[in-house]
Amino acid sequence: MKKTIDEIDLHGLTVDEAIPSVDRFLHQSYKARLRRVWVIHGRGTGVLRSAVRQYLTKHPLVRHCATANGDRGGIGATQVELAD
């Protein structure tokens, strides 16, 4: 999967490592005026995906999040719409 400025790859991170990384990424993305970003968490057991999505649903900069389209990782990634 191609890495771009609008995505963060959490492969290999624990939940405790991933959440602060996602928070920094969201703030940087918001400052860069991005409105749609992707969080790549992998398919695996779903532990990281669940923790990240739970965090995203409560984050003040997140308007909406959902499973990414197949070309952006499908169930292994989450598409995030940032607030205006």
Which residues fall in each region the model found?
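Long, charged, low-complexity intrinsically disordered regions
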Residues: M1-D84
